[in-house]
Design a protein with these regions (language model features):
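N-terminal hydrophobic targeting/anchoring segments and the immediately downstream early-domain regions
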Residues: 1-187, 193-203
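Histidine/acidic residue-rich metal-binding segments in metalloenzymes
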Residues: 46, 169-183, 200-242
Length: 242
Protein backbone atom coordinates (compact mmCIF):
# COMPACT_ATOMS: atom_id res chain seq x y z
CA UNK A 1 0.00 0.00 0.00
CA UNK A 2 1.30 3.46 -0.85
CA UNK A 3 2.58 5.29 2.21
CA UNK A 4 0.55 8.49 1.78
CA UNK A 5 -2.88 6.81 1.83
CA UNK A 6 -4.63 7.44 5.16
CA UNK A 7 -8.00 5.77 4.56
CA UNK A 8 -9.95 8.56 2.86
CA UNK A 9 -13.16 7.53 1.05
CA UNK A 10 -14.72 9.55 -1.76
CA UNK A 11 -17.06 12.36 -0.68
CA UNK A 12 -16.79 11.38 2.98
CA UNK A 13 -17.18 15.07 3.86
CA UNK A 14 -20.80 14.89 2.64
CA UNK A 15 -23.78 13.45 4.53
CA UNK A 16 -25.19 10.30 2.93
CA UNK A 17 -28.86 10.49 2.12
CA UNK A 18 -28.77 14.29 2.30
CA UNK A 19 -25.85 15.68 0.30
CA UNK A 20 -25.07 12.50 -1.60
CA UNK A 21 -26.95 9.28 -2.34
CA UNK A 22 -26.55 6.34 0.02
CA UNK A 23 -26.08 3.86 -2.84
CA UNK A 24 -24.01 0.90 -1.65
CA UNK A 25 -20.70 0.66 -3.47
CA UNK A 26 -19.13 -2.63 -4.46
CA UNK A 27 -15.87 -3.48 -2.75
CA UNK A 28 -13.02 -3.69 -5.23
CA UNK A 29 -11.92 -7.14 -4.11
CA UNK A 30 -15.41 -8.52 -4.85
CA UNK A 31 -15.83 -7.10 -8.34
CA UNK A 32 -12.73 -8.63 -9.91
CA UNK A 33 -11.07 -11.89 -8.92
CA UNK A 34 -7.40 -11.82 -7.99
CA UNK A 35 -5.02 -12.62 -10.83
CA UNK A 36 -1.75 -13.79 -9.34
CA UNK A 37 1.48 -14.75 -11.10
CA UNK A 38 3.77 -16.70 -8.81
CA UNK A 39 7.32 -15.32 -8.63
CA UNK A 40 10.43 -16.74 -7.04
CA UNK A 41 12.58 -14.64 -4.67
CA UNK A 42 14.83 -13.34 -7.45
CA UNK A 43 11.88 -12.30 -9.58
CA UNK A 44 10.19 -10.63 -6.60
CA UNK A 45 13.35 -8.64 -5.90
CA UNK A 46 13.56 -7.61 -9.54
CA UNK A 47 9.96 -6.40 -9.56
CA UNK A 48 10.52 -4.44 -6.35
CA UNK A 49 13.62 -2.75 -7.76
CA UNK A 50 11.74 -1.74 -10.92
CA UNK A 51 8.82 -0.38 -8.89
CA UNK A 52 11.16 1.58 -6.62
CA UNK A 53 13.27 3.03 -9.41
CA UNK A 54 10.84 3.63 -12.27
CA UNK A 55 7.70 5.72 -12.66
CA UNK A 56 4.54 3.80 -13.56
CA UNK A 57 1.90 5.65 -15.59
CA UNK A 58 -1.44 4.41 -16.94
CA UNK A 59 -2.71 6.38 -19.93
CA UNK A 60 -6.30 5.12 -19.61
CA UNK A 61 -8.18 4.54 -16.39
CA UNK A 62 -11.66 4.92 -14.91
CA UNK A 63 -10.54 4.67 -11.26
CA UNK A 64 -13.99 4.64 -9.69
CA UNK A 65 -16.26 2.39 -7.70
CA UNK A 66 -19.59 1.15 -9.04
CA UNK A 67 -22.77 0.18 -7.18
CA UNK A 68 -23.02 -3.20 -5.49
CA UNK A 69 -26.42 -3.65 -7.18
CA UNK A 70 -25.31 -2.46 -10.59
CA UNK A 71 -28.46 -2.95 -12.66
CA UNK A 72 -30.69 -1.43 -10.00
CA UNK A 73 -28.61 1.61 -9.07
CA UNK A 74 -26.42 2.51 -12.05
CA UNK A 75 -28.88 4.99 -13.60
CA UNK A 76 -29.28 6.95 -10.35
CA UNK A 77 -25.51 6.77 -9.75
CA UNK A 78 -24.70 8.26 -13.15
CA UNK A 79 -27.45 10.88 -12.88
CA UNK A 80 -25.96 12.11 -9.62
CA UNK A 81 -22.63 12.98 -11.23
CA UNK A 82 -20.57 11.96 -8.22
CA UNK A 83 -18.71 8.82 -9.24
CA UNK A 84 -16.65 7.64 -6.27
CA UNK A 85 -12.90 7.59 -6.83
CA UNK A 86 -11.43 4.26 -5.67
CA UNK A 87 -8.73 5.70 -3.41
CA UNK A 88 -7.98 2.49 -1.52
CA UNK A 89 -7.61 0.49 -4.74
CA UNK A 90 -5.20 3.11 -6.11
CA UNK A 91 -3.16 2.85 -2.92
CA UNK A 92 -2.68 -0.89 -3.50
CA UNK A 93 -1.29 -0.56 -7.01
CA UNK A 94 2.03 0.47 -8.52
CA UNK A 95 0.77 3.44 -10.51
CA UNK A 96 2.40 6.78 -9.76
CA UNK A 97 0.20 8.62 -12.26
CA UNK A 98 -3.07 7.85 -14.01
CA UNK A 99 -5.01 9.51 -16.80
CA UNK A 100 -8.59 9.58 -15.51
CA UNK A 101 -11.09 9.46 -18.39
CA UNK A 102 -13.93 10.48 -16.08
CA UNK A 103 -17.52 9.40 -16.88
CA UNK A 104 -17.24 9.49 -20.67
CA UNK A 105 -20.37 8.29 -22.46
CA UNK A 106 -22.13 7.43 -19.20
CA UNK A 107 -22.01 11.08 -18.14
CA UNK A 108 -25.80 11.23 -18.34
CA UNK A 109 -26.47 13.79 -15.63
CA UNK A 110 -28.99 15.77 -17.68
CA UNK A 111 -29.22 13.78 -20.92
CA UNK A 112 -29.41 10.09 -21.75
CA UNK A 113 -27.25 10.74 -24.81
CA UNK A 114 -24.25 11.91 -22.79
CA UNK A 115 -21.36 14.15 -23.85
CA UNK A 116 -23.08 17.42 -22.95
CA UNK A 117 -20.90 20.43 -22.10
CA UNK A 118 -22.61 21.19 -18.79
CA UNK A 119 -22.50 17.53 -17.77
CA UNK A 120 -18.79 17.07 -18.31
CA UNK A 121 -18.09 20.26 -16.33
CA UNK A 122 -20.23 18.92 -13.47
CA UNK A 123 -18.39 15.59 -13.63
CA UNK A 124 -14.98 17.25 -13.67
CA UNK A 125 -15.86 19.80 -11.00
CA UNK A 126 -17.24 17.18 -8.62
CA UNK A 127 -14.16 15.01 -9.05
CA UNK A 128 -11.82 17.93 -8.39
CA UNK A 129 -13.84 19.01 -5.36
CA UNK A 130 -13.46 15.54 -3.89
CA UNK A 131 -9.73 15.51 -4.67
CA UNK A 132 -9.38 18.83 -2.84
CA UNK A 133 -10.62 17.22 0.38
CA UNK A 134 -7.78 14.70 0.63
CA UNK A 135 -4.03 14.65 0.01
CA UNK A 136 -3.27 11.18 -1.37
CA UNK A 137 -4.33 11.65 -4.99
CA UNK A 138 -3.08 14.96 -6.36
CA UNK A 139 -4.41 16.90 -9.35
CA UNK A 140 -1.61 16.71 -11.89
CA UNK A 141 -1.04 19.84 -13.97
CA UNK A 142 2.60 19.44 -14.97
CA UNK A 143 5.26 16.73 -15.26
CA UNK A 144 6.82 17.78 -11.97
CA UNK A 145 3.64 16.69 -10.18
CA UNK A 146 4.25 13.11 -11.33
CA UNK A 147 7.76 13.12 -9.88
CA UNK A 148 6.40 14.61 -6.65
CA UNK A 149 3.73 11.91 -6.40
CA UNK A 150 6.37 9.22 -6.85
CA UNK A 151 8.64 10.64 -4.16
CA UNK A 152 5.80 11.19 -1.66
CA UNK A 153 4.06 7.83 -2.08
CA UNK A 154 1.04 9.43 -3.77
CA UNK A 155 -0.78 9.15 -7.10
CA UNK A 156 -0.95 11.97 -9.65
CA UNK A 157 -4.31 12.15 -11.45
CA UNK A 158 -4.55 13.74 -14.90
CA UNK A 159 -8.17 14.50 -15.96
CA UNK A 160 -8.90 13.61 -19.59
CA UNK A 161 -11.77 13.43 -22.09
CA UNK A 162 -11.99 10.65 -24.66
CA UNK A 163 -14.06 12.69 -27.10
CA UNK A 164 -14.33 16.35 -28.08
CA UNK A 165 -18.07 16.42 -28.85
CA UNK A 166 -18.82 18.64 -25.81
CA UNK A 167 -16.84 21.57 -27.24
CA UNK A 168 -19.32 21.65 -30.16
CA UNK A 169 -18.09 24.47 -32.45
CA UNK A 170 -16.52 26.54 -29.67
CA UNK A 171 -12.74 26.60 -30.06
CA UNK A 172 -12.15 28.45 -26.79
CA UNK A 173 -13.72 25.58 -24.86
CA UNK A 174 -10.42 23.77 -25.37
CA UNK A 175 -8.73 26.50 -23.36
CA UNK A 176 -11.45 26.34 -20.71
CA UNK A 177 -10.96 22.59 -20.33
CA UNK A 178 -7.20 23.05 -20.06
CA UNK A 179 -7.77 25.64 -17.35
CA UNK A 180 -9.86 23.13 -15.41
CA UNK A 181 -7.09 20.54 -15.66
CA UNK A 182 -7.78 18.53 -18.83
CA UNK A 183 -4.42 17.57 -20.37
CA UNK A 184 -5.52 14.94 -22.92
CA UNK A 185 -8.58 14.88 -25.18
CA UNK A 186 -9.79 12.59 -27.93
CA UNK A 187 -10.85 14.00 -31.28
CA UNK A 188 -13.89 11.72 -31.49
CA UNK A 189 -15.37 8.92 -29.40
CA UNK A 190 -16.32 6.41 -32.13
CA UNK A 191 -19.06 8.66 -33.54
CA UNK A 192 -18.37 11.70 -35.72
CA UNK A 193 -18.56 15.22 -34.33
CA UNK A 194 -17.64 18.73 -35.45
CA UNK A 195 -13.94 17.81 -35.54
CA UNK A 196 -13.85 14.60 -37.56
CA UNK A 197 -14.98 11.01 -38.12
CA UNK A 198 -15.12 8.25 -35.53
CA UNK A 199 -14.43 4.53 -35.82
CA UNK A 200 -18.12 3.62 -36.02
CA UNK A 201 -18.74 5.52 -39.24
CA UNK A 202 -18.88 3.70 -42.59
CA UNK A 203 -16.97 6.51 -44.28
CA UNK A 204 -14.15 8.62 -42.86
CA UNK A 205 -14.11 12.20 -44.10
CA UNK A 206 -11.01 13.13 -42.15
CA UNK A 207 -10.57 16.25 -40.04
CA UNK A 208 -13.06 19.01 -40.70
CA UNK A 209 -11.91 22.60 -41.06
CA UNK A 210 -12.93 23.14 -37.46
CA UNK A 211 -11.08 19.97 -36.49
CA UNK A 212 -7.88 21.36 -38.00
CA UNK A 213 -8.30 24.53 -35.94
CA UNK A 214 -8.92 22.43 -32.83
CA UNK A 215 -5.76 20.40 -33.40
CA UNK A 216 -3.80 23.62 -33.85
CA UNK A 217 -5.21 25.05 -30.61
CA UNK A 218 -4.51 21.87 -28.65
CA UNK A 219 -0.91 21.94 -29.82
CA UNK A 220 -0.57 25.61 -28.88
CA UNK A 221 -1.79 25.18 -25.31
CA UNK A 222 -0.08 21.83 -24.73
CA UNK A 223 -3.03 19.43 -24.64
CA UNK A 224 -2.19 15.92 -25.84
CA UNK A 225 -4.43 14.40 -28.53
CA UNK A 226 -6.03 10.94 -28.22
CA UNK A 227 -6.89 9.08 -31.45
CA UNK A 228 -8.01 5.80 -29.87
CA UNK A 229 -11.61 6.01 -31.14
CA UNK A 230 -10.88 8.06 -34.24
CA UNK A 231 -11.22 7.01 -37.88
CA UNK A 232 -8.07 6.14 -39.81
CA UNK A 233 -8.09 9.12 -42.17
CA UNK A 234 -8.99 11.50 -39.37
CA UNK A 235 -6.08 10.10 -37.35
CA UNK A 236 -3.69 10.61 -40.26
CA UNK A 237 -4.95 14.18 -40.58
CA UNK A 238 -4.34 14.80 -36.88
CA UNK A 239 -0.74 13.67 -37.35
CA UNK A 240 -0.31 15.86 -40.42
CA UNK A 241 -1.72 19.00 -38.82
CA UNK A 242 0.03 18.57 -35.46
Amino acid sequence: MKSAYKGYEAYSYLEKGKDISSIEMCKGDKRVKEYLIELDDIQEAKVKSIVDEKIFISLHEHPVLFPEHLERDIFEYNREGKQRCAYEALSRGYYDAIFDNLMDGVCTITSNSGWKWDDILIDLGMRLCDLAHQDFVIKCEKVEDIYRAKSEGKVALIPTLEGAAPIENELDRIDILYGFGIRLMGITYSESNALGSGLKEEKDGGLTNFGKKAVERMNKIGMAIDCSHVGVQTTLDVIEYS
